[in-house]
Regions:
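Basic, alpha-helical nucleic-acid-contacting "clamp/cap" segments
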Residues: 31-44, 75-140
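Substrate-binding beta-hairpin/strand module that engages nucleic acids
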Residues: 3, 7, 186-194
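Catalytic-site neighborhood detector that most strongly recognizes the C-terminal catalytic loop/helix
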Residues: 19-20, 28, 84-89, 105, ...
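Short, basic (Lys/Arg/His-rich) helix/loop patches that form interaction surfaces
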Residues: 39-49, 110-117, 122-125, 134-187, ...
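Basic, Lys/Arg- and aromatic-enriched nucleic-acid-binding interface segment
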Residues: 2-68, 76, 94, 126, ...
């Protein structure tokens, strides 16, 4: 069988094997540390802080929040419709509709609607920077340490949590603290193989 497979492959009758995709996990805080983190986050009155809070409430990827545009938002229906072209591994014609909780709608209503992007950047940039959300997490971590707290570390990797790690935090919370089937959290995270 091995020789037959080699002959078929070498002769061009079999497609090349797919490369193995190794997932690189992003540092995430423990889900029971999130309430303390939110206390620090809610004290901040900056666009990146509101963007990070919105990301936590919607469980979106940081880049989806960074590039969220006003035409994708329907405040009356309480939805954010993300085109597949902006999502990881999605068909460009596919849509992902995110239901918005009241606080997420409140955040959106507080943002200026004068530009293309929901979360505008500083110094004339159209959208917040790629690092804005992560820098906010790092600043909150430092603020916690300065006030005698333990900060917001990923215990497995011994690294400061990052914005993308909020998705893992949600996944862990859903598994540990709810009775929902795993597929519900997977669909919330817009994972394709759900």
């Amino acid at each position: 069988m091995c020789c037959l497979m080699t002959i078929l492959f070498m002769g061009g009758w079999l497609p090349p094997a797919k490369r193995i995709h190794h997932t690189k996990h992003k540092p995430a805080m423990r889900h029971h540390d999130l309430p303390e983190f939110m206390k620090f986050l809610l004290k901040r009155d900056t666009t990146p802080a509101r963007a990070l809070e919105f990301q936590i409430l919607t469980i979106a990827r940081p880049t989806e929040v960074q590039f969220a545009e006003w035409p994708e938002i329907n405040l009356d229906e309480g939805t954010w419709t993300i085109p597949g072209s902006k999502m990881k591994n999605r068909n460009p014609n596919e849509l992902h509709v995110v239901p918005l909780v009241p606080r997420a709608i409140e955040i959106l209503r507080s943002m200026p609607q004068s530009g293309r992007y929901v979360f505008p950047g500083y110094q004339g940039k159209e959208q917040i920077s790629e690092n804005a959300l992560n820098n906010t997490v790092k600043a909150i971590h430092q603020e916690s340490l300065k006030s005698g707290g333990k900060g917001f570390m990923d215990p497995r990797y011994n690294k400061i949590a990052c914005a993308h790690g909020m998705r893992s935090c949600f996944k862990n919370f859903a598994a540990a603290r709810t009775d929902f089937d795993d597929v519900v959290s997977e669909l919330s995270l817009a994972h394709l193989d759900s």
